[in-house]
Structure formats: structure tokens, C-alpha cells
Swiss-Prot record:
It comes from the Bacteria. This is Malate dehydrogenase. Its EC number is 1.1.1.37. Belongs to the LDH/MDH superfamily. MDH type 3 family. The keyword 4Fe-4S does not apply. InterPro entries: L-lactate/malate_DH, Lactate/malate_DH_C, Lactate/malate_DH_N, Lactate_DH/Glyco_Ohase_4_C, Malate_DH_type3, NAD(P)-bd_dom_sf. It comes from Bacillus israeli. Substrate binds at residues 87, 93, 125, 156. The active site is at 180 (proton acceptor). It holds the Pfam family Ldh_1_C.
Amino acid sequence: MAIKRKKISVIGAGFTGATTAFLLAKKELGDVVLVDIPQAENPTKGKALDMLESSPVLGFDANIIGTSNYEETADSDIVVITAGIARKPGMSRDDLVQTNQKVMKSVTKEVVKYSPNSIIIVLTNPVDAMTYTVYKESGFPKHRVIGQSGVLDTARFRTFVAQELNLSVKDITGFVLGGHGDDMVPLVRYSYAGGIPLEKLIPKERLEAIVERTRKGGGEIVNLLGNGSAYYAPAASLVEMVEAIVKDQRRVLPAIAYLEGEYGFEGIYLGVPTILGGNGLEQIIELELTDEEKAALEKSAESVRNVMKALI
């Protein structure tokens, strides 16, 4: 039997989707299918061809195609969903809910039809509610429908800590839990620089400022860009999750998971520490939290529930 490369479909060929497709191919994680709506088929094909023509220079052999035809995605191992409208300055995540929910339902039907055994990773905002929508619409088991936010939020936190300490980001570890919004919960107590607790290295008021900047990280970029939202770091975060799955690395990474009693929550998608491997989300890790951390996570979960109330 012939051995084939993994097949990864990226739904949505905007800045985030296209950047994700490019990084996936560059790392040779699989052949990539970049999908967008029929009105954007030619630009999508153009982006894919442009990426492919970089392969001799960058030295990768993965194939990339652009299309609006979901038949091209058939038998994908992983489907990454980035499609939807982008956040604009002054727009709350709640404003996005109903428009992007319709997009999720439409995309999910196609994914189920053509790739019924795939693992789905959702990025579209508001990501906690959109991941829940895809889970319900797909009928897939919970370990095969995952949301991405914690890797990105943790990356932002690690970036700001590294800048504060003038250290390599490689030596900074941390976890950001909860919903992908202003009530996310950076766990300072579980964050380290070269194995040393951050609380031993950074004054409390500076740590609090870093936590607050992390919470507002997406909005900071939205305001600086003036049009659109972040895409390099979100794409890189998606790729880290995909790599953990296709290589069965069993990485400990924060991800948006469906909770059934973990951390005291039921029937909600929320960012928690997980193990990602060949089966998708293989395990949820329950950390011991202080009363203050529990209260912050409950507040974050309540924010997610409030967004979910807008779901049709």
C-alpha cells in the first residue's frame, strides 16, 4: 500500500488562513487545500500557486492548491476553520456571533460530508462559541473538535514576559486559561523563566500589567492595524496544534475543549491545559487552582456563556 502525506484543509483564505496554509506547507506537515467562497476562487488559487512557487527556494515538497470546491478537501486528516468576518475597531466579539455562526454551520456540513473522520480545529471568533457550534453541527466526538486560543494567548504572554526580563522566549513557559477575551486567565503561578517562578523575577505590579496587556493583546493589534486583526501569531499557533496532532507528539498545550465536569463546568467549550496527539485532544489536565484563580476562571466561563446566549 502506498504511503501518503497527511492532508490538511484550511477553510478561509484570508490573511490568517493563507498564512496558516503557507506555514503548514513550509513545515511539510501535509499537502494543503486552501478553500474560500466561489467569489474568491481565483485569488485563492493565486495565493496557493504563489506559495507553491516558493517551494524550490524554501525547500519543501508539500503540495498546495486553492479552490472553492469542497470535493477537493475529501478525506482530509485535519480541517482548520478560519473563515468568517474579521473583528473591526470598536467591534465586540459578541457582535460577531450570529454572522459567523451561519458560516460555521455551512462549513461544517461540507466537512462532515467530505471528511467524516477528520479532526477539526476552529479559530473563527468568538472562538469558544464557534467551536461549540461546530461540535454540535458536526456530531463529531468532542476530542475531534478543538478550538485555538490558548496557544496564541500564551504566546502573547510569553512574548511580553521575555521583553520584560530581556530573556529568550524559549525559556519562558506559561498557561493562559479560560475564554478568548478580556476575562482570560493567565496563570502566573504556573509560569516560569528557565524554571524560576515569574513571581520571583518580576515585581507584582509589572506582572499585573503584563497580564492585562495579554488580555487586551488582540485588541491592541486591531487598533494598530486599523483594519483587520492579527494573523501571523494566530496562524503560527494553529500550526503548532496541527503539528502536535499529525506527528502524535502528545504536547501539553492549552486548547479550547468541551468540558463535562472538568474544573466544575458542564457543557461548555473553554480554554484549559490539554494533551494534543494523534487522536486530537487526548486528555484534559486539571490543575489545582486557588480560590482566586477559580473565581477568575468562573468569570471567564460566564463571559463565554453570555456570548453563547446569542447563538441562534
